[in-house]
Amino acid sequence: MTNIRKTHPLMKIVNNAFIDLPAPSNISSWWNFGSLLGICLILQILTGLFLAMHYTSDTMTAFSSVTHICRDVNYGWIIRYMHANGASMFFICLFIHVGRGLYYGSYTFLETWNIGVILLFTVMATAFVGYVLPWGQMSFWGATVITNLLSAIPYIGTNLVEWIWGGFSVDKATLTRFFAFHFILPFIIAALAMVHLLFLHETGSNNPTGIPSDADEIPFHPYYTIKDILGILLLILFLMSLVLFVPDLLGDPDNYTPANPLNTPPHIKPEWYFLFAYAILRSVPNKVGGVLALISSILILILMPLLHTSKQRSMIFRPLSQCLFWVLVADLLTLTWIGGQPVEHPFIIIGQLASILYFLIILVLMPITSSIENNLLKW
């Protein structure tokens, strides 16, 4: 008799995705981050659901309701900090997951990669509207500054900004709609993640060598389920260490001051995971140029398959490209640091150089280096 997991319409889908899935036998720990992102999403949806039970999306009571959650709700403080630091974990996993895709040439799976870029944009949008909800100083001014960037769009810009605000400034209408967006977007992310997996399972996973692994595959369960559980335990260990010892390490102290439209904070900056993009935005003196640079910094990922000139898929056997990849990582860390600094000398020039280098590496140096490596191998 055939096992029910192979015949039942629903269980068959789960079986083919997580149990009997043929997986390459040599995928390393860098392949753990897909499952970790799934866990992060589930964790964020669950903690967010419990927070939404006590939160009020009104400018008069939003800040107080978050304080109430932390002080009066049973275990409210841990739910709130798991949600806030869970977002940081989400982005750490996201950046590593994208970096893995760049390093090992996973972007040659076009549909999977493009859905992934859409997912990245959606998660960034969700995190942005979520940061506005506690209605602290940085929430209010962050929302004002970032939504204002849309006014750079010619002709319709100003009308568009006021339409998003629901008035002439960031106010009650803005907070209410941002809460609605923040509630619905994670479910859209979950749906997109399923499409992401669907396309991935059409081709099968990539592996560190970048060559087809059809000849040497193993069942996903028990080998990779055990490996994923180890990754999940380490993720929870890291997250709970943050939550229980230094819950405010990655937050901004200004957000513990209730929003005040009459008092601008000295340094307006987003959460740490947006600082690299914020630094690129600030490095262009022109408003429209800055907005275009900001969007391009993420949208450039869609061009990766077109910019791939190497005869090899993975970087594992390409030392020159490896060096360039790690320079890119260092450059992104530099941009993250610059994004958190005030707009003054020498930070302005460092930010501009780092921004130029970011686009230069991806658009020019990587394709040229790949071609040089092809010639060195006489291909």
Curated annotation (Swiss-Prot):
Q: Which cysteines are joined by disulfide bonds?
A: none
What CDD domains does its record include?
cytochrome_b_C (cd00290), Cytochrome_b_N (cd00284)
**Protein's gene:** MT-CYB
Similarity remark: Belongs to the cytochrome b family.
Name where it's found: Mitochondrion inner membrane
List the membrane topology term(s).
Multi-pass membrane protein
Which positions in this protein are listed as binding a ubiquinone?
A: H201
Question: Which Pfam family is one of those matched by this entry?
Answer: Cytochrome_B
Single GO biological process annotation from the record: mitochondrial electron transport, ubiquinol to cytochrome c
Chief localisation class? mitochondrion
Q: Where are the transmembrane segments?
A: 33-53, 77-98, 113-133, 178-198, 226-246, 288-308, 320-340, 347-367
Instruction: Specify which residues bind heme b b566 according to the UniProt entry for this protein.
Output: H97, H196
Keyword Cell inner membrane among UniProt keywords: no
Protein name (database record)? Cytochrome b
For the keyword Cell membrane, the answer is: no
